[in-house]
């Protein structure tokens, strides 16, 4: 199959400014500089990492920190997520309705950092089973100790959390630390303030027993406060063990450990360990070459990590401690050793946190399972194996870092310097785009590219030579009103209409071409009826209707000709007669239509699927979350309109017969025996591309790292051992090598012959579930014809060069 590659699309992801982990440590929130917030599901190794939610917040209000607290009393299983802003406001992020709401109006003073008070009275004898796995943090308090969120796992304590108002401390630019109550009310309630000090309050943290508050400021001082009386207990001069005078030092980060140790990171690149009872210096390390922006601790509190402006993550370990050791010495006799560093980021690191991979739930709802005996047999024959990940295991904490290069990396806590970190999102903030092949404009191929506040219609030019290159030319650009952030967009199959939605509402445009004018391409706006803003939108296959998924959790269908609302759907888990039910389901974030115009598949942000019959204008089927995982990509097969193909974040593929309301025959036979090479498919699946040939039953599944060809008409083959990541050879393959005249052993000749054997085997017959790795981050893949595809990619170093912030490694002239 011919691949035409294009890298001319602009791609500029936004830096990550803050991280926070959920109360059960299974999710990580990442706030970006452009005001957006992402929720990531934590997974061992490369498989299962998934950006579950993206909420588009206010781009004009820069987020400074995040705090995530548990709140089961008000029916929020994920807890409540708060963010502070440089403009002095505090927002709560609604993870169900996908919106940002202000809970504290701007106080007129920048808030640099927030910290949640731990809940006292925690019982260390209680071991929790959370999120489907047995906690392996034996006797740990589950306190992560990330100053970015200040959150602790507080599910187990003597007094019910429903009876306790959490206290949120905010370090403010005027030198004051303000305390707020988090109750069941929507707004935060002001509680009290600590005395104002000279300089700016830049960092804040609580002691594990919540009896003391520590604050760091721009005057180089660390202050200890009594949380009850709000009186100053003592103050520390941060420059004592570090570099520079105290008046020049900014204390950016503080971390309080259970062993009565306070850790500080400052603008001189120094990390200092203090006796938190008396304020005396225990240890000072000046290993960073720039500001220390963030600190985090392992759950056992015998390891501390620091990161900052030099792009390094550094590990310090309590001398004499073992993995998971709880025998912490008195703070006065502790010695903290520098162990080493890992440098995965090209730019400043802004945030660290610690999270825990979770186990997967039962793969299927019972009503669509094959017989249990068959399921058990297949699962036994092909178990899911996570051992290849080497260091990442279910229930074992891992460190997460993020920064100005827009990347997120995961590290082993216990074997930090032994293994390379895992790149969680190789293509951060991937550009949404949609291709129209054979448009109504002389069969011109068009590409719709969604920017932050712009929509570009590009013309695709495919090279006729053997270079395999494709280029683009801009035809029109549409800017959103008042430069508002665009949430979603769509273009019709003919290219004649396109639409987008910002946080105010949707807009529809018509694209026209007139060969006899100076500017042949023009755009006219079509006036839509009053509609809520959309999370997703799509045109019907015949281009006669625009379908949008409103933020009010309803689905609206608009006639393109009359511009009138035709009908509205309300997704539901149960069948309803007569009046539409009140919207109760999570917001719809993905829409797909069949090529014959009969079916609409709507997928919510958690992976539930609602199938609607557009002919009868009724909901046809509800499919609950598959494999306990989110849906990453989907689509109707163009030549079998009843076949809905679904890909999940756990690297499973399902083919449904929507008309019969059941799994298709292929899924019943093969879902549990997918090749291991596909279960270990690198990167999160981003999309599907179906072959346009009427005789084809194949689909290309792609991530930012690789492509995989799946043919539903071919049998699912067993793995060959040389396809596995560990590189070990099976006895079968060794036998084949001997038959080819290759002796066992090592050496370049043997490796060359093995490579030739693999290449010859792959060229003779294409395997089903064949995986082709990509050299650069892939943004989009789409079929141009039966035997050719368009691959839009971008070398990561080209992206790095385009970022606003300078990389850490700067070339010095003359060196």
UniProtKB/Swiss-Prot annotation:
GO terms for cellular component: nucleus. Coiled coil: none annotated. The keyword Nucleus applies. It is found in: Nucleus. One of its GO terms (biological process) is embryo development ending in seed dormancy. Keywords: Developmental protein, Nucleus, Repeat, WD repeat. Gene3D superfamilies: YVTN repeat-like/Quinoprotein amine dehydrogenase. Residues 139-153 have a biased composition (Acidic residues). It comes from the Eukaryota. InterPro entries: PCN (IPR044622), WD40/YVTN_repeat-like_dom_sf (IPR015943), WD40_repeat_dom_sf (IPR036322), WD40_rpt (IPR001680). This is WD repeat-containing protein PCN. It comes from Arabidopsis thaliana (Mouse-ear cress). The gene is PCN.
């Amino acid at each position: 199959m011919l691949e035409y590659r294009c890298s001319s699309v602009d791609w500029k992801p936004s830096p990550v400014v803050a991280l926070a982990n959920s109360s059960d440590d299974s999710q990580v929130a990442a706030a970006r500089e452009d005001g957006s917030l992402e929720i990531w599901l934590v997974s061992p190794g490369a498989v299962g990492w998934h950006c579950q939610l993206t909420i588009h917040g206010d781009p004009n209000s820069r987020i400074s920190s995040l705090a995530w607290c548990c709140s089961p009393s008000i029916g929020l299983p994920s807890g409540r997520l708060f963010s502070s802003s440089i403009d002095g406001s505090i927002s709560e992020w609604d993870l169900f309705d996908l919106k940002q709401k202000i809970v504290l109006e701007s106080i007129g003073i920048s808030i640099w950092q927030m910290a949640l008070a731990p809940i006292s009275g925690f019982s260390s004898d209680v071991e929790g089973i959370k999120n489907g796995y047995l906690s392996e943090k034996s006797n740990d308090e589950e306190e992560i100790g990330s100053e970015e969120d200040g959150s602790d796992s507080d599910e187990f304590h003597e007094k019910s959390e429903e009876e306790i108002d959490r206290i949120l401390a905010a370090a403010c630019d005027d030198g004051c630390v303000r305390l707020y109550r988090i109750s069941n009310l929507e707004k935060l309630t002001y509680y009290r303030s600590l005395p104002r000090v000279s300089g700016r309050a830049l960092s804040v943290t609580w002691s594990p027993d919540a009896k003391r508050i520590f604050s760091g400021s721009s005057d180089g001082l660390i202050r200890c406060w009594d949380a009850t009386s709000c009186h100053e207990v003592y103050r520390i001069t941060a420059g004592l063990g570090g570099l520079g005078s105290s008046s020049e030092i900014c204390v950016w980060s503080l971390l309080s450990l259970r062993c009565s140790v306070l850790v500080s990171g400052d603008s001189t690149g120094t990390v200092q360990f203090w006796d938190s009872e008396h304020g005396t210096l225990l240890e000072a390390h000046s290993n960073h070459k720039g500001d220390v922006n963030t600190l985090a601790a392992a759950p056992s509190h015998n390891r501390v990590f620091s990161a900052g402006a030099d792009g390094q993550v550094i590990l310090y370990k309590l001398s004499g401690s073992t993995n998971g050791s709880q025998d912490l010495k008195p703070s006065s006799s502790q010695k903290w050793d520098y162990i080493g560093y890992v440098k995965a980021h090209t730019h400043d690191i802004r945030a660290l946190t610690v999270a825990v991979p979770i186990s997967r739930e039962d793969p299927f709802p019972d009503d669509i399972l094959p017989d249990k005996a068959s399921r058990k047999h297949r699962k036994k024959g092909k178990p899911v194996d996570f051992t290849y990940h080497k260091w990442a295991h279910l229930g074992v904490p891992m460190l997460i870092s993020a920064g100005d290069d827009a990347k997120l990396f995961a590290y082993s806590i216990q074997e930090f310097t032994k293994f390379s970190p895992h790149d969680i999102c190789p293509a951060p903030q991937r550009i949404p785009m949609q291709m129209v092949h054979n448009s109504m404009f002389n069969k011109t191929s068009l590409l719709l590219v969604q920017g932050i506040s712009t929509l570009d219609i590009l013309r695709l030019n495919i090279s006729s030579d053997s270079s395999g290159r494709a280029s683009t030319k801009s035809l029109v650009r549409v800017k959103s009103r008042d430069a508002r952030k665009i949430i979603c967009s769509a273009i019709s199959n003919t290219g004649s209409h396109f639409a987008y939605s910002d946080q105010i509402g949707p807009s529809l445009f018509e694209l026209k071409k007139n060969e006899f004018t100076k500017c042949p391409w023009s755009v006219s706006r079509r006036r839509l009826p009053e509609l809520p803003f959309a999370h997703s939108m799509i045109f019907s296959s015949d281009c006669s209707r625009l379908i949008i998924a409103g933020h009010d959790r309803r689905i609206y269908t608009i006639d393109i000709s009359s511009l009138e609302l035709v009908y509205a759907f309300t997704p539901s888990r149960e069948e309803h007669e007569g009046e539409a039910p009140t919207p109760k389901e999570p917001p719809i974030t993905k829409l797909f239509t069949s090529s014959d115009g009969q079916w609409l598949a709507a997928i919510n942000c958690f992976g539930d699927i609602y199938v609607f019959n557009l002919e009868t204008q009724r909901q046809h089927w509800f499919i609950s979350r598959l494999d306990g995982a989110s849906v990453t990509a989907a689509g109707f097969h163009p030549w079998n309109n009843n076949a809905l193909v679904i890909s999940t974040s756990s690297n499973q593929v399902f083919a449904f017969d929507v008309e019969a309301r059941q799994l298709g025959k292929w899924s019943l036979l093969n879902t549990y025996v997918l090749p291991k090479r596909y279960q270990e498919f690198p990167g999160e699946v981003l999309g599907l591309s179906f072959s346009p040939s009427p005789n084809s039953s194949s689909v290309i599944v792609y991530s930012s790292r690789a492509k995989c060809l799946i043919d539903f008409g071919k049998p699912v083959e067993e793995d060959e051992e040389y396809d596995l990541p560990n590189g070990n050879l099976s006895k079968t393959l060794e036998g084949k090598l001997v038959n080819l005249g290759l002796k066992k052993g090592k050496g370049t000749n043997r490796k060359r012959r093995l490579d030739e054997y693999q290449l010859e085997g792959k060229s003779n017959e294409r395997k089903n579930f064949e995986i082709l790795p990509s050299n650069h981050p892939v943004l989009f893949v789409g079929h141009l014809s039966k035997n050719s595809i368009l691959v839009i990619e971008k070398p990561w170093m080209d992206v790095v060069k385009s970022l606003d912030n300078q990389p850490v490694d700067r070339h010095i002239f003359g060196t």
